[in-house]
A protein has these predicted regions:
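Post-HEXXH active-site segment of zinc metalloproteases
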Residues: 243-263
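Helix-rich, well-folded core regions that mediate interactions or catalysis
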Residues: 82, 119-152
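Long, K/E/R/D-enriched contiguous segments that form extended
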Residues: 136-188, 192, 242
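Short pre-active-site segment immediately N-terminal to the catalytic Zn-binding motif
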Residues: 159-165, 171, 178, 213-234, ...
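A glycine-rich phosphate-binding loop feature that marks nucleotide/adenosyl-phosphate handling sites
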Residues: 32-37, 91, 137-155, 189-198, ...
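Catalytic zinc-binding patch centered on the HExxH motif and its immediate surroundings
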Residues: 158-163, 196-216
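His/Asp/Glu-rich acidic catalytic environments and adjacent acidic regulatory segments
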Residues: 1-114, 118, 122-125, 171-175, ...
Length: 263
């Protein structure tokens, strides 16, 4: 009876995620960033990180202020949406009689809550190297105070690696060669048969994802030609081949996999 109620409430319970996705991916518009020489640069989810990698600190700060000032205008909307999401998770956990929402989230993954907490504790205990890195970055950049918009720019000037998508695919194939020709054949199939939505577009969500559809997986990218974009291509294709092999070789009941296995 309880599961029938939860199933009936499923679409309603998904509303917080739907609302935030529409706000973030479709409705938010950001002012142009202005460089030190006065040139204007459009700010979108896709252009933000490349702007953060500019050696022009004026441009970086302008892009940062552009993005976060708009998010700040909707902070109450975002807070209410997050609150609704938390209430949804708490509702499901209580109805299913879990001790906590953490227990509910980890159920089915075979990952004990102790592992989750130990991971966080280990990160907290290991902040020292990160603090030293931040101090080194501040010194190398020659700034008195390090800001969020100083964290992406290369600390060595004159190093700019840009790749076309065709070059990124070639790098991916070379990197994955040790996994064998059968694996490479699937990668090529994905490259040649439109599995990938490559570039940023208006209304397209930010980030990168792989969706393991039945016909074949689909990959969402927002490719800008950076080295990180090349890494992301390889990473997401890994998810896609995982899904493809699982879907073609496992019974339906066993095709899905948990996030801990995927990553």
């Amino acid at each position: 009876k309880e599961e029938a109620i939860l199933a009936a409430a499923g679409e309603m319970a998904a509303s917080p995620d739907d609302i935030y996705s529409m706000l973030n991916d479709a409705d938010l518009k950001f002012p142009d960033a202005v460089a030190g020489d006065g040139e204007k640069h459009p700010v979108t989810h896709g252009t933000y990180i490349p702007l953060m990698q500019s050696y022009d600190r004026v441009l970086r700060k302008s892009a940062f202020d552009s993005l976060y000032s708009v998010y700040g205008q909707f902070r109450n909307t975002s807070a209410a949406t997050l609150s609704a999401q938390l209430k949804q998770l708490l509702f499901y956990a209580k109805v299913r009689k879990y001790p906590s929402t953490l227990d509910a989230a980890l159920d089915g993954t075979e990952v004990p809550t102790e592992i989750y907490r130990n991971l966080i504790d280990a990160v907290h205990r290991s902040f020292g190297p990160m603090y030293r890195y931040v101090e080194l970055r501040k010194k190398l950049l020659g700034v008195d105070e390090l800001h969020m918009y100083d964290l992406y720019v290369p600390v060595v000037e004159g190093v700019e690696m840009k790749f076309t998508f065709e070059e990124a695919k070639e790098i991916a194939l070379k990197a994955l060669a040790p996994l064998g020709e059968d694996y490479l054949a699937l990668i090529r199939e994905g490259f040649e048969n439109r599995w990938i939505d490559v570039y940023e577009n208006e209304g397209k969500r930010s980030g990168a994802y792989s969706a393991g559809a039945r016909v074949h997986p689909y990959v969402l990218l927002n490719f800008k030609g950076t080295l990180d974009d090349v890494f992301t291509l390889v990473h997401e294709m890994g998810h896609s081949i995982h899904s493809y092999l699982s879907n073609t070789r496992q019974p339906t009941a066993y095709q899905d996999y948990v996030i801990f296995v995927a990553e």
